Amino acid sequence: MNKIFIVVIIMLITSCATIPAPTVRPFADSHDWVLVEDITYQIGESGLAITVPKGFVTDFASIPKTLWSFGLSPHGPYSKAAIIHDYLYWSQGCTKEQADNILVIAMKESGVSVITVTTIYAGVHLGGESSWLSNKTERDKQFPKIIPAEYLKFPDNVTWTEYRQELIKKGVKDPEFETNPAYCKLGNSREIPKHG
């Protein structure tokens, strides 16, 4: 009986998908951060995953300072979901709507409160278009946002804006991104996908 109980508990714990804690390094202004290792998010029980590569630069959640006093800031229980969302907004393999919905799913799986999920979703849904278009413009200009391994040891006193300019001068470009990866279809809903 005890063995069955332990197996059930293990199954419950492992079935609660969460995004692993990222290992990041800040740039000098602590506005932008770089992933020191890949982060892979298994989306619900779908069997599909999003991997944000080592070297990706994120600002976590782009929440205006005016909202920080209301308990929302760039860093919170939604930070891991924000990294996934930043990557989806940068790579643009999914539509903006799909990226926003995957953010909701990731926040739900991270245990973010319903009120916070709703507030952040409203922000990206209504106000994220400028970031989406800005990212497209930067990608069209072939600006990098994924730092190759050989450039990950940057000085502690450099900002992302400064370091990015150095990378551009050296001809660093992002890898090609997959168009319409299989996980995008999960963004046609805001519900955590079940098995199958």
Label each PLM-derived region with a short phrase.
Residues 4-14:
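Sec-dependent N-terminal signal peptides
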Residues 16-196:
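Extended terminal accessory/targeting regions
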